[in-house]
């Protein structure tokens, strides 16, 4: 890992985290918790085995990740973020929020996984009606399943299928994530292939952290979401 050789905290942070794939490895460890090497590789489509090994060693050297040999029946090494590694979560959340402006287009070769669907509502939305009754929203995007649970003023998410959801949102990732994060409204999401079944009024409870993300240069500004 090369250094910028600058006495600046931004440069020092990039010395540790600025290489390609490094922050995505941190993302996976934040979302999955302690991981086997194979779990990490599965969560990082496109990374070469030797590169993942190198990045993990660099993160270990920087004291952001620990490697522990798990006892049988697991009998494999588990990678886990240290306290310093977990301290990157607010920075990743801020970076993810800033990155919404570049989510207007979904490229044909973009990979997608359920974990990336599940974290978005918890990170990017708040409950606009915290005194309302609990509600459950089932998300289905590119065949990946996640659940939003609203209650007690909290927005919680998990992977999997809900037993009796109040609302089901099913469509391509761009439509589902775009709607949840306020990048597109319900009408536009429908044009993008979203199917909404059930109490669509629940969407009004999901207040985006940024109601109208600033578009990247050359992109049109979306209209506020309306349920």
Feature map (PLM): residue ranges:
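C-terminal interaction segments
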Residues: 162-227
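Acidic, aliphatic-rich amphipathic alpha-helical segments
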Residues: 84-150, 200-227
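Key DNA-contact positions within bacterial/archaeal DNA-binding proteins
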Residues: 50
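Alpha-helical DNA-recognition elements
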Residues: 58
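N-terminal helix-turn-helix DNA-binding core of bacterial DNA-binding proteins
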Residues: 8-47
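Residues within the DNA-recognition helix of helix-turn-helix
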Residues: 55
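Basic, amphipathic "hinge/linker" alpha-helix immediately C-terminal to the N-terminal HTH DNA-binding motif
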Residues: 18, 71-94
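Short hydrophobic beta-strand motif reused across regulatory alpha/beta modules
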Residues: 64-65
């Amino acid at each position: 890992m090369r250094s910028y050789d600058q006495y600046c905290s931004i440069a020092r942070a990039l010395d540790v985290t600025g290489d390609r794939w490094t922050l995505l490895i941190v993302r996976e460890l934040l979302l999955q918790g302690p991981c086997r090497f194979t779990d990490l590789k599965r969560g990082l489509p496109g990374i070469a085995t030797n590169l993942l090994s190198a990045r993990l060693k660099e993160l270990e050297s920087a004291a952001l990740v620990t490697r522990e040999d798990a006892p049988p029946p697991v009998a494999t090494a588990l990678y886990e973020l240290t306290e310093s590694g977990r301290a990157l979560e607010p920075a990743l959340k801020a970076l993810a929020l800033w990155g919404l402006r570049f989510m207007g287009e979904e490229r044909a070769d973009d990979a997608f996984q359920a974990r990336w669907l599940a974290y978005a509502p918890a990170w990017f939305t708040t409950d606009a009606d915290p005194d309302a009754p609990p509600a459950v929203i089932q998300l289905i995007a590119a065949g990946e399943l996640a659940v939003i649970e609203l209650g007690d003023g909290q927005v919680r998410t998990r992977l999997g299928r809900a037993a009796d959801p109040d609302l089901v949102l099913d469509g391509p990732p761009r439509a589902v994530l775009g709607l949840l994060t306020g990048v597109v409204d319900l009408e536009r999401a429908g044009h993008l292939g979203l199917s909404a079944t059930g109490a669509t009024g629940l969407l009004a409870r999901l207040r985006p952290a940024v109601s109208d993300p600033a578009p990247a240069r050359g992109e049109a500004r979306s209209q506020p979401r309306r349920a």
